Structures are given as C-alpha cells and as structure tokens.
C-alpha cells in the first residue's frame, strides 16, 4: 500500500529538473501519482476502507491544483508531464 523510500527516490530522480530537486511541481505531481496508484491497488482488495479513500481524494485534489499551477506557468512542461505519467487520454 505505502510507497517505499526507494520507489520515491526513483521517482524523484526520474522527474527532477536539476540534481537535488525535490520540490518542483513536476516532482510533486509524480510522487502524488505514485501514491495514488498504490492506493488504487489497495482499494481493489479493501473496498470498504473509507478512511483511506478520503486521503486518496485529498491527494487527487492536491495533484489537480499542482497541475493547474504548472499549466498556468509552463504549458509545455505540463503537456510533457501528463504524457509521461499517462494522466490524460
């Protein structure tokens, strides 16, 4: 269910702009997407886990806000990021 430190570090390395970058919107969205995907797998087994579902909805909302911010600041990076993460169809 939880994302391990190694998985999180790998996501940071894959999406960082420069070495040591952990706070850019791209990295934050990628980390949230990883956590959201792990929770979605969790809900396949634990359908009645409503407490965690509330946390999932908060993460989705936070990711949406970060994506809106990124789209308003740099639409090229936004399009590249959603393609890499496979968020839009």
Swiss-Prot record:
Alphabetical list of InterPro entries matching this protein: Ribosomal_uS15 (IPR000589), Ribosomal_uS15_bac-type (IPR005290), uS15_NS1_RNA-bd_sf (IPR009068)
Keywords, comma-separated and alphabetical: Ribonucleoprotein, Ribosomal protein, RNA-binding, rRNA-binding
PROSITE patterns: RIBOSOMAL_S15
Pfam families: Ribosomal_S15 (PF00312)
KW Mitochondrion (keyword) present: no
Source organism superkingdom: Bacteria
Record-annotated membrane-spanning stretches: none
GO cellular component terms attached to this protein's record: cytosolic small ribosomal subunit
Classification via NCBIfam families: S15_bact
Quaternary organization: Part of the 30S ribosomal subunit. Forms a bridge to the 50S subunit in the 70S ribosome, contacting the 23S rRNA.
Family, similarity comment: Belongs to the universal ribosomal protein uS15 family.
Annotated protein name in UniProt: Small ribosomal subunit protein uS15
Species the sequence originates in: Nitrosomonas eutropha (strain DSM 101675 / C91 / Nm57)
Gene: rpsO
């Amino acid at each position: 269910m939880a994302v391990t430190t190694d998985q999180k570090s790998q996501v940071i390395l894959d999406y960082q702009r420069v070495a040591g970058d952990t706070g850019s919107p791209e990295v934050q969205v990628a980390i949230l997407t990883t956590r959201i995907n792990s929770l979605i797998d969790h809900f396949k087994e634990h359908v009645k886990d409503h407490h965690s579902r509330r946390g999932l909805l908060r993460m989705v909302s936070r990711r949406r806000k970060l994506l809106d911010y990124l789209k308003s600041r740099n639409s090229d990076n936004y399009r590249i990021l959603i393609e890499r993460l496979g968020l839009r169809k």
